[in-house]
């Protein structure tokens, strides 16, 4: 339990760091709501970016995936096994390697949640069934909790960070 609380605190710290470092206004709270999209608009736009990411992943299409990620050395992919890959180029190389085997993401959209943590930052969390396997080996499927930090850029919503954690109790509630 203590470990879960510690991890939750770490995750919140990262989100708050992202909200001030990735937002175009340095994290400042706007003086008025003008120019800030509504929660329903934000949710629709973030869901659309997430759908493009999933489609690109399942098609093993680097051009689609790269278009929805923030192209930065600060991009991080915290993987299921505990490793972290830092940097856009490094993450894209890791995806391309993983795609040589079995690789499929099946988001469970009935539990998808999105929250805005700043005017230009949103977090999407959803369970997924993650299937992977080395080339020539039978694939395995495990339930994971997928989390992404999305930032609003001039080109639209992009993913700045991915967090994949085990979700052994998925489907038990």
Language-model features and meaning:
Residues 120-130:
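A short hydrophobic beta-strand element
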Residues 114-122, 150-156:
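A short, structured loop/turn motif at beta-sheet edges
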Residues 44, 62-117, 141:
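A solvent-exposed, acidic/Ser-Thr-rich amphipathic alpha-helical stretch
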Residues 22-68, 173:
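Short, low-complexity N-terminal intrinsically disordered segments enriched in polar/charged residues
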Residues 102, 130-140, 168:
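Short, cysteine-centered beta-strand-loop-beta hairpins and adjacent loop/turn segments enriched
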Residues 1-10:
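Bacterial N-terminal signal peptides that target proteins for export
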Residues 24-28, 143-171:
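Short beta-strand edge/turn micro-motifs at domain boundaries
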